[in-house]
């Protein structure tokens, strides 16, 4: 019999219950007990949703981030959060976001609260984790209480499950040494704590534990490979069965290593690396389980179940009970339930599968393998019809778009003149001071904005009323910025629910859901649009709003667009053609918008590429091809404008030291980046690379409610000036201010502008 299991389930709830519960708690509108009760309610619901599985995940739920959970399980807390009042949950949120719900945190430091933990991308996904912090003297101590609580809850519900934990080597690999120490030097201190955790689970009668080591799909040097051997040799003596889980790609040159580790089972990503399975069957010892990720855990298209069975059936005959099947990775990266999508186009809806539907697909596969295809003939026939419908649909293919792609040539991505010739023309047109100030684009999405949007979508507010409401919010943003004396303004994006979905709603070839939310970090959720067909722009998307905002002020107003690579990487993308082709289609559509903004008199146009880096393949050997088409797509989008039009781009959550040459090749006049959480460490790239254009290193962390001081910002900018000539520096926040409140934004920007004025006085 084939065993079914799942690596992880979305934790936010089908209606984002966790998001709203967290935000109520942080605002002091609910108690700690109420938040914990909500967590228990969601876990119970999700385990019930997974009852048909042979083994459901336990411990995959988190109030913020699973890596942060592991840090607390291992007793690895930053010293700056120690000594505060409150319980473990308070300290947990202090690390995650700089403060808890405790009022005492308001005055803990000069900024209020403490410095939040650094946040970065989880491998090549749009999920973000809190980076573990290490020092040479870091010690670990086990606190399994959270995991044991979830285990007890699952057992009380009669759930057959397996605890899920992050592996010791991946945990170290994901972290950052805050001194010059070697993270791997901590492995001898870390392994006994992991051993104690496994012993604790054994004492609880746990048979299987899932240990995630996704670094096995990355390029590892000899030291990290040896660390994996050392770790699992040390843990082998425990009396618990270990399923070692890998995902997000092929094992590649780590295949033999993974197959040889002394564990009881190995899970592999059979979506991205199906061709490795035969080799694993040969190399795995005869007593080991092989779990294949046969359902795509990162995308929302239905699985071709008949084709998958054609592949799985010989494997099941060969392996028998040693074969397990599961999604390729945790379902954290897909929405919860397609059944909620009653307004989605029925044809497109028939092509999709969210988390619950993927579990249904898994059960169909298992039934077919264990009892024969006849037992699920109706389900297989319905699946085949949906797959064929999508393949044949004329809505997927647009000959005009394909013809436009064929006309792309090398010249399309080139500016008329190099930056050195453009910069004086832009300076003359814009007349900006030294250390010019700006923001990244969005301002707070207030309750009034959200209410107006809901009323407009429901029909309770007509188009004229909605336009008037949005114009009022835009005017408020402009007046606030003028009062703050910012130099280059933005319209605030009141009309946009999301920086990607907003454009997806207006492009042919896209569909959008009502409840297709996935977690980005903490309480932050995104609703990726669905890129199902060839992309084109029927009409202008932003010109009306930007020109209205510009009419309110004499200061430069930035046109705000999301770039093609970010739209691609933050969408659920069709899987029937190369991603590069879809990206070029997006580039042509956004290019038309750039040119329309310029024709309307917009002098500064920002094209956000926040997700450029996250699209990088996990293996460096594959980076070149991706960067070639990603950079080319940006250049096609941006480079049709005149020399005196200033092009900005923005990148957030990105470590870009290793791709700085490609970023320079994008040839944006100004790049703004996230740097504050890393204390300007991201600028280390400029020690060895002379970045030719202008740059705005983010000077305060918008993901934390803490207010930066003027002196703190001045200090950060002085660090930046050690690497970038002062005449090419801008002063700006890390990212957009959509998720903050005006009461936080105004004092933070006041201090930022004051810091810029101080810097100007110091360089005169």
Curated annotation (Swiss-Prot):
Reaction(s) this enzyme catalyzes, per UniProt: 5-methyltetrahydropteroyltri-L-glutamate + L-homocysteine = tetrahydropteroyltri-L-glutamate + L-methionine
Binding site for L-methionine: 440-442, 493, 608
GO terms, biological process: methionine biosynthetic process; methylation
Pfam family of the protein (one): Meth_synt_2
Gene3D superfamilies cross-referenced by the UniProt entry: 3.20.20.210
Active-site residues, Swiss-Prot/TrEMBL: 703
Residues that hold L-homocysteine according to the record: 440-442, 493, 608
MF annotations from Gene Ontology: 5-methyltetrahydropteroyltriglutamate-homocysteine S-methyltransferase activity; zinc ion binding
Residues the entry annotates as binding Zn(2+): 650, 652, 674, 735
Function in brief: Catalyzes the transfer of a methyl group from 5-methyltetrahydrofolate to homocysteine resulting in methionine formation.
Protein name: 5-methyltetrahydropteroyltriglutamate--homocysteine methyltransferase
Organism: Burkholderia ambifaria (strain MC40-6)
Gene behind the chain: metE
